[in-house]
């Protein structure tokens, strides 16, 4: 999950400050004590999102690393970036920023036959198409998990035709895709585990490697929950025409990559489960803190290594319903009558939060960047909302309430996550009132309705 390794990176920043202190320069606030600088750095790093944390992480590496001992990789030439193959897999991914027609061509290739879609519709599935997009948010993903479980217990949660996930949302999405039978696992993942179950400190990685933390605990958690039986369930649902997409970021190309996890699960390749797990880990990989995930591809018979990291670096939440509009409105699919519905779970607060800002460089930078990031996330919501207005899709938004005031004593504090899970659960179990437009767009929504 994005932010899982936050504490490790903060420790690395502390090390940088100690280094600067010994060298006699570079202090953030010469009038304050060094301890205060460290405390300010902790607060600064705690609030930064993956895309902008990268700059601080890079700074720490530049200041402390004389050389790296990372194993060399065979980098894919820029000219071949659009010609890659993954051995044993076909049509399993697309660029998230590609033209809709190109994406649609990939998604429609080898689609299940009409009789499979009709069989799905016959399983008492509502005639309306339901889409779900789950954002990242680190430990705040507990809100989305609780919301989904409470929604199930309210008896109103639909089966989703399309589910997308990024970062912590990527770890929620497969369970949401499979349905309420997996709610127990969702509850477990976001209430049973803490920081030590997610990562271990690896300060030596600043000097010797590509990461500040060891992601082995998180990888083991993914392996625990994503087993062969789990993959078979995903494959069965994909055969019915349902779609699960997970987003990663290709660092070499600076582009979002969307993975069709159902097609990976349907593959007969023995490495399908390995790739499935890798993609979940990559989507949750905060760059510079966790090591990037290498994914081997082939071009012209030669093997190359791509570097994939947190999907939230390029998209905090994503959906592309227009790509699937032909299927959503196809009468043969059993979903041609009612208006499709999109549900967006934003694992974070979208309301302004007041805070007294100290007049020093750290506080000013901290507040400015956290404000920028919050508004970037809202910008993603605007983009999605505009697509739904264009394509005639009902927009529904959930986010952490402004009055949720529980705080964490440490990253991934179980007490905090349990409280947030229960808040999401309580809201959904009492018939949650979904917001019909992003902040500031309510009047536009009312004018069109």
Would you name each region that the model predicts?
Residues 3, 24-26, 55:
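Residue-identity detector for glycine
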Residues 55-65:
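Bacterial N-terminal signal peptides
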Residues 165, 169:
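Gly/Ala-rich beta-loop-alpha elbow adjacent to hydrolase catalytic centers
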Residues 2-8:
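Extreme N-terminal basic, low-complexity initiation segments
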Residues 68-162, 177-449:
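Patatin-like phospholipase
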Residues 34-55:
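Bacterial N-terminal signal peptides that target proteins for export
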């Amino acid at each position: 999950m994005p932010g899982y390794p936050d504490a490790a990176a903060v420790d690395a920043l502390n090390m940088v400050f100690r280094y600067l202190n010994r060298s006699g320069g570079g202090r953030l606030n010469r009038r304050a004590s060094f301890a205060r600088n460290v405390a300010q750095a902790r607060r600064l790093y705690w609030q930064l999102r993956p895309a902008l944390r990268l700059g601080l992480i890079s700074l720490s590496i530049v200041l402390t690393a004389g050389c790296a001992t990372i194993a060399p990789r065979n980098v894919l030439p820029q000219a071949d970036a659009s010609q890659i193959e993954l051995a044993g897999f076909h049509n399993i991914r697309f660029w998230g920023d590609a033209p809709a027609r190109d994406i649609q061509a990939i998604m429609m290739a080898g689609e299940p036959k009409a009789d499979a879609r009709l069989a799905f519709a016959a399983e008492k599935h509502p005639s309306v198409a339901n889409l779900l997009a789950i954002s990242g948010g680190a430990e705040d993903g507990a809100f989305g998990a609780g919301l989904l479980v409470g929604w199930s217990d309210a008896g109103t949660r639909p089966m989703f035709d399309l589910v997308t996930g990024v970062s912590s949302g990527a770890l929620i999405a497969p369970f949401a895709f499979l349905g309420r039978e997996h709610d127990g696992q969702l509850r477990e993942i976001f209430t049973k585990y803490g920081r030590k179950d997610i990562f271990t400190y690896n300060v030596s990685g600043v000097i010797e490697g590509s990461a500040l933390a060891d992601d082995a605990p998180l990888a083991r958690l993914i392996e625990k929950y994503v087993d062969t039986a789990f993959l078979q369930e995903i494959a069965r649902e994909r055969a019915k025409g349902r779609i699960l997409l997970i987003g990663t970021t290709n660092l070499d190309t600076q582009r979002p990559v969307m993975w069709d996890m159902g097609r990976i699960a349907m593959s007969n390749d023995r490495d399908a489960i390995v790739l499935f797990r890798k993609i979940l880990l990559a989507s949750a990989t905060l760059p510079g803190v966790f090591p990037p995930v290498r994914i081997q591809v082939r071009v012209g018979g030669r093997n190359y290594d791509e570097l994939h990291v947190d999907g939230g670096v390029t998209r905090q939440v994503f959906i592309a319903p227009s790509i699937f509009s032909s299927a959503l409105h196809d009468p043969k699919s059993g979903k041609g009558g009612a208006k499709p519905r999109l549900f967006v779970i934003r694992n974070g607060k979208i309301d302004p939060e007041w805070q007294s800002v100290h007049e020093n460089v750290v506080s000013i930078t901290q507040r400015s960047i956290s404000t920028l990031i919050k508004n970037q996330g809202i910008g993603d919501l605007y983009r999605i909302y505009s697509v739904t207005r264009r394509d005639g899709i009902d927009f529904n938004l959930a986010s952490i309430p402004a009055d949720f005031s529980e705080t964490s004593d440490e990253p991934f504090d179980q007490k905090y996550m349990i409280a947030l899970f229960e808040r999401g659960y309580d809201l959904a179990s009492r018939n949650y009132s979904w917001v019909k437009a992003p902040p500031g767009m309510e009047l536009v929504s009312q004018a069109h309705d």
